[in-house]
A protein has these predicted regions:
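Short, surface-exposed helix-loop/turn micro-motifs enriched in polar/charged residues
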Residues: 53-55
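C-terminal, well-structured catalytic/ligand-binding subdomain of enzymes
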Residues: 5-34, 57-59, 64-168
Length: 168
């Protein structure tokens, strides 16, 4: 099993322009879900395509597979970056960049800290219900102080890559 999630970053949209396959954020996710069996295959596929961000923003992705591999994909200045999970480590993500040279750009550091604390305390092992409760605890549904616009989590899903199930 393989799963992928996407999170919005308020930044210039990624627009790669080479001679590779052109895909948007959502079509790339669909392509990866249809064709990639694991994280390494997905990374190879992304390296061989040009990303064109949807929603006039930038995005980063977190992907995982049934073998316990996980990676975050970020596009910085239209260049693909891969941040792999450390062996025996945990990986989690909110709406700010985690690439070392731009770490912290964006929002959601408070929600990231909740993820970090909860997952660390539980050694990364949560039931489906506990996982959904954690996603609810870090979801957004508020009016932005910066723009006056509503900021909301669009969906939350708990994936079990071993059983190949998803809980909404």
């Amino acid at each position: 099993g393989f799963s992928i999630g996407v999170l919005l970053i308020k930044d210039e949209p990624t627009q790669q322009n080479t001679d590779k396959l052109d895909l948007t954020t959502t079509s790339a996710m669909r392509w990866l879900l249809d064709k990639a069996a694991n994280v390494e295959e997905a990374i190879t596929m992304l390296e061989n395509m040009d990303m064109h961000a949807s929603a006039n923003a930038s995005h980063h992705f977190q992907m995982a597979d049934a073998q316990g591999n996980s990676a975050v994909i970020e596009y910085i200045d239209n260049e693909l970056r891969v941040i792999r999970k450390e062996p025996d480590g945990l990986q989690y993500l909110t709406n700010f960049l985690i690439s070392e040279d731009v770490y912290g750009f964006g929002k959601g550091q408070d929600r990231y800290e909740i993820l970090e604390n909860t997952l660390t305390q539980n050694h990364g092992i949560l039931s489906e219900m506990e996982s959904m409760d954690l996603l609810q605890a870090v979801s957004q549904d508020k009016i932005s102080e910066d723009t006056g616009k509503q900021t909301a989590t669009q969906w939350s899903v708990v994936y079990n890559n071993t059983k190949k199930t998803a809980k909404i």
